[in-house]
Design a protein with these regions (language model features):
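Two-component histidine phosphotransfer core
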Residues: 1-171
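A short beta-turn/loop motif at secondary-structure boundaries
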Residues: 175-176
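Short C-terminal beta-strand
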Residues: 180-186
Length: 186
């Protein structure tokens, strides 16, 4: 049994009409995020600009529950053309969601998330890093890994078709302030 996305968006848009101010803005962002998620889920690759726009909408929605201690830094190298660079859909969003959900939500104190996209020779490097204590294999807060499996399967398909391989790494890193973080890189 499936619900029609058209029906869901009609109901949400009707609900949005009955709200005002900040409540309307939040619901509008949620609707935008859901609509864009459906669109992106149908595409194998998107531009970096599209992916970062989607990620920014997601981060903005999460900001309320994470509070003022949640700080995000997004850096894109000047030599990276966000309109031309294609990458697998959800490549950045899924690790960002994982970082927020599994590392930063329950963290005390400052919660940091860094997204860095830069050129290294002929390659583009994408890094998503958090200060949530690092990846713990046996943690109770660990998810099912479904999101990362989707990314890995997509990368596997692309690597089978393309000359240039996409390499993936998930590892814990020491941060300059003495904390440990998790870094996902492509």
């Amino acid at each position: 049994n499936r619900m029609s996305p058209h029906f869901i968006f009609n109901v949400l848009n009707q609900e949005m009409g009955s709200r005002d101010g900040e409540n309307k803005k939040e619901l509008s962002s949620l609707v935008k995020l859901m609509r864009r998620n459906l669109e992106l889920a149908e595409q194998m690759c998107v531009t970096l600009k599209e992916e970062l726009g989607f990620v920014q909408t997601y981060i903005d929605l999460q900001r309320r529950s994470l509070g003022p201690e949640f700080k995000v830094t997004i850096e894109v190298g000047e030599d990276v053309d966000t309109n031309q660079l294609l990458l697998p859909s959800m490549l950045i969003q899924i690790p960002v969601e994982n970082a927020i959900k599994h590392a930063l939500q329950g963290k005390e104190g400052e919660r940091r998330l860094w997204i860095d996209v830069h050129r290294s020779g002929t390659y583009i490097c994408v890094r998503i890093t958090d200060n949530g204590g690092g990846f713990k294999l046996n943690s109770a807060n660990r998810g099912t890994g479904t999101g990362m499996k989707v990314i890995m399967q997509t990368i596997q398909i692309l690597n089978a078709k393309n000359k240039e391989m996409i390499e993936t790494s998930v590892h814990n890193i020491p941060l300059p302030d003495g904390e440990t973080g998790c870094e996902v890189s492509f």
